[in-house]
Amino acid sequence: CTQLLRQALTELLKQPLLLGVSAINDPYFDENGALVTLKADNSHAKVALAGVMLAKLYLMLNKIIHDKHIELTRFALPAKVGVSDEAQTDAMTQLLNSVSKKEQMLILLPNAGLKQIGSYVQVQSVKRPTTVYERECAVFDGGSDAMMQRLAEVRNSVLTTESNG
């Protein structure tokens, strides 16, 4: 899982659209999942978009791996992912544990982040929210054709690298 996530991150950050975005940490999985911290190296960097794209890319990769493991009667868990700014990390962890469903992406970003991803993704609200965070949280509901095509290409590149490595 860790190797797959790192490879996905490396391949994704090569995309011209995400120029100026870099990872602060070297992500790894533990009993709580994995955390990737991204930063903007300049004012034009689309760090919120990079977070959403990485989350979706990981879901796409995990689905393939999960389905393959099930087919081979091996144990595998479906993934849940969340995208937030650093200030909302704890809130996102709570949301992932309370309202997130398998193979779903939750997004908890300030308005500037939501504006940045607005022309690339569609979101919906959490159904029947009971907390402030649940009201502020968005659920990924699809991406633009161009973004999804780009992610499919990156996914294929990661899978090709994985099978050769």
Regions found by a protein language model. Give the residues of each.
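Residue-identity detector for threonine
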Residues: 2, 10, 37, 73, ...
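Intrinsically disordered, glycine/charged-rich C-terminal tails and inter-domain linkers
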Residues: 60, 87-88, 94-165
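A short glycine-enriched loop-to-beta-strand structural element that forms part of the catalytic core
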Residues: 21-39, 67-89, 106-109
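Catalytic NTP-binding/metal-coordinating core of nucleotidyl cyclase/transferase enzymes
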Residues: 1-50
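Conserved helix-loop functional segments at active or binding sites
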Residues: 14, 18, 60-68
